[in-house]
Design a protein with these regions (language model features):
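Short, small-residue-biased leader/transition segments that mark boundaries at the very start
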Residues: 3-4
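Hydrophobic alpha-helical scaffolding
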Residues: 8, 24, 28, 36-37, ...
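Active-site-adjacent helical/loop segments in soluble small-molecule enzymes
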Residues: 41-101
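Catalytic phosphate/nucleotide-handling subdomain of diverse soluble enzymes
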Residues: 91-151
Length: 153
């Protein structure tokens, strides 16, 4: 919700202008996950505005579900997606499964933002069973936000 909506720096060092965004705090140190560009501390400014205006919704996709979706996509489409794209694929699969259960017909669109050829080691780790899911608690998030305070003051 809006509890996480605030202004924050776009970089860890705090050199950028303050940006309106949904953020975990520019001092956020993520777990060692294999999600490439998803290690960023906040949603981009445009995405944050779309979320605020209820024109889109954000969903949480754990990395194991993401890699499972990426493997399915690679097997069915012949394209190895980047881990970032695999999160979008997993969300599209979830939505398609909901439609299958309810009988609703929808056009489901996702963005394949890149290939995963640079990140094959992550797929190897997934296939070997060496990856685990990781989730932040609300307490972890609040602690991080308390550390940065209200930067807009």
């Amino acid at each position: 919700g809006d509890v996480y909506k605030r202004q924050d720096f776009g970089d860890e060092a705090g050199y950028t202008p303050l940006l309106p965004m949904f953020t975990l705090g520019h001092n956020f140190a993520p777990a060692h996950i294999h999600a490439g560009g998803l290690r960023y501390h906040g949603a981009g400014v445009i995405v944050s505005q779309l979320l605020k205006d209820n024109l889109m919704e954000a969903v949480d996709i754990q990395q194991l579900e993401s890699f499972e979706a990426g493997c399915l996509f690679a097997q069915s489409e012949g394209i190895i997606p980047a881990p970032e794209s695999s999160h979008a694929i997993a969300a599209a699969i979830r939505e398609a499964n909901k439609c299958k259960e309810t009988g609703e017909e929808k056009i489901i669109l996702f963005n394949l933002s890149g290939h995963g050829l640079i990140d094959m080691a992550s797929y190897d780790k997934y296939l070997a069973g060496d990856l685990v899911n990781y989730a932040l608690t609300d307490d972890d998030i609040q602690k991080n936000l308390d550390e940065i305070g209200d930067l807009a003051k």
